[in-house]
């Protein structure tokens, strides 16, 4: 929807210009001002719609990006302080790179260069999701992943933690480094140990 909003603002721009304008617009966007593709419709069908004037919970949203069709909802209701900070930093970086690209100082390849997540921080938390079968593992990992945002909220409430940045990638752990409470000698090929890495920086 952010791309669509950019296209609305620059309807005749080329693809390259749209990419640059995307980063320009949203590097300067003053959140929590909402991104709207169209004005909300006054349709009285008794569905709950995003409206911070009425719903106190909507007022707490940090990065509201509102779906255009009725009933309008905030598509980014799960964004917290840390994820907002991470996205803002990435968008600012994208704007800096596209500025250089548009000025002919670098190529588009630079915009897609991968970053080393583990070089950004000094402190890490590793979540290990372990179960006995592949079927159980799939369900268990899904449950663990669904609860990570609650862990982030807890970390953000710690005054000594400035940022909690989730790494969405999963890793197979080194068996010798697993905690002793996990059965390292299980040779069942259906057992999948996945580590979900988080990182936090102290203020």
Where are these regions (language model features)?
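Non-catalytic helical "accessory" subdomain of NTase-fold nucleotidyltransferases
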Residues: 1-203
């Amino acid at each position: 929807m952010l791309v669509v909003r950019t296209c609305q603002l620059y309807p005749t721009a080329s693809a390259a210009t749209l990419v640059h304008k995307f980063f320009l617009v949203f590097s300067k966007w003053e959140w929590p001002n909402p991104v709207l593709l169209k004005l909300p419709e006054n349709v009285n069908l008794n569905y709950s719609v995003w409206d911070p004037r009425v719903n106190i919970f909507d007022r707490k949203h940090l990065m509201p990006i509102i779906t255009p069709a009725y009933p309008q909802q905030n598509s980014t209701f799960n964004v917290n302080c840390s994820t907002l900070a991470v996205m803002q930093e990435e968008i600012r970086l994208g704007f800096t790179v596209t500025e250089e690209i548009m000025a002919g100082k670098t190529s588009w390849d630079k915009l897609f260069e991968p970053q080393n997540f583990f070089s950004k921080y000094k402190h890490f938390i590793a979540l290990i999701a372990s179960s006995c079968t592949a079927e159980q593992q799939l369900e268990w990992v899904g449950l663990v992943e669904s609860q990570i945002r609650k862990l982030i909220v807890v970390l953000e409430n710690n005054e000594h933690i400035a940022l909690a940045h989730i790494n969405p990638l999963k890793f197979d752990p080194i068996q010798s480094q697993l905690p002793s409470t996990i059965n390292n000698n299980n040779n069942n090929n259906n057992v999948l140990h996945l580590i979900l890495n988080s990182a936090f920086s102290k203020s």
